[in-house]
């Protein structure tokens, strides 16, 4: 299955122009199997997203994009978000003890909000985006190289704030994702890989990229 793991919805992300229903319509049009809403410092969409999933049969998971002192991290499985800014390690520890996971968002983006080379050494980091929709290609390539050095595959996410951005990059999971726990397990076990949307379908990265599903 294929999920876009990084999307902002306008209710709780003031810089987003897109609502949940139109996000889902676009996601379905592009062939996504599910989406993750990751608003800035908020998981306020959780209840509505759960209801939408039950009513419409389209998986909508909710995490949050949290700015730490070292950079942005997508957290999932953390019901109560911190009320104040934390160091990345403290946020990851908080997620871990609550059964959640942390994914570094756009680690090499040149905006002062990426973890950079810390993705290579930060304990507790489950994955990181190697294909990020709002990140320039050379900086995504740095993330890809870091993943190769670590023997990991990494994630893909659009970081969509506009409708046309939804699904530009996404994450492939070889296993069925039918619950939040399925998603958390797949991320934790590195059973995922980045994909990009091209000519009407999603494609895995080729070349020297390594996959570790089996």
Question: Which residues make up each language-model segment?
Answer:
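Short, N-terminal intrinsically disordered low-complexity segments that are rich in Pro/Gly
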Residues: 12-17, 35-39
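Aromatic-lined carbohydrate-recognition surfaces of secreted/lumenal glycan-active proteins
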Residues: 103-111
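Divalent metal-dependent hydrolysis catalytic cores, especially in the metallo-beta-lactamase
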Residues: 4, 24-41, 101-103
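Charged catalytic cores and adjacent phosphate/nucleic-acid-binding surfaces used
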Residues: 1-9, 13, 19-25, 44-48, ...
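Short, conserved beta-strand segments within well-ordered enzyme catalytic domains
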Residues: 36, 59-61
